[in-house]
Amino acid sequence: MIGNDVVDLDDPESRSAARHARFDARAFTVAEQTMLRTSADGERLRWVLWAAKESAYKAARRDDARVTFAPARVAVVPDREGATEFVGEPRHADAGVRYRVCVDGRRFRVQVRVGAGYAHALACAADARVGTLWSAIARVPDVTMASPGALVRRLAIALLAGALREPPAALAIVRVGRMPLLTVRGRPAPLTLSLSHHGCYVACACAAPARGGVG
């Protein structure tokens, strides 16, 4: 199980002036609110934690579509063990902050990377055996030129065509229920795909299972 989420840190709805006075109480646990109050950069941390919650929720939904998003009940705790390796992430992104996240009893490892203007989170089930993780993020100068959904699918196909050594025309992304599915030459690929967009950013992540394991 994987999930990814991107937050445009410069989007108007990400600014403090646009935020409801009770947003933090509704979105974060008591421990997380303490982290925000004591952080040297609470604004950035707020959206790092939010992206961690969203990415883990998306991963949990893959396991059970009945899972609902109640952010204040999604606990995010700093994790100083292990690391999630991103393949294809921009070099200007920082090394990432790792968290452990619990959603409806399901546990996830999450890494959030912050670049110039965005926070990008990637969540994996804590007990998953994952082979390769690919991810990509792109800034779209004019999001009115095409739908964000079309843009993020284009990004994912460009990333995975290179990884799989297939021409982009051989790849397609379809929906099965609410989940994206990658097909290669018309056949479902044994990969788990997650798509995300917010503001001027689109992002994707894809996991291949480890040999003898599940992703």
Q: Which positions does each model-derived feature cover?
A:
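Core catalytic alpha/beta fold that binds nucleotide/phospho-ligands
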Residues: 1-215
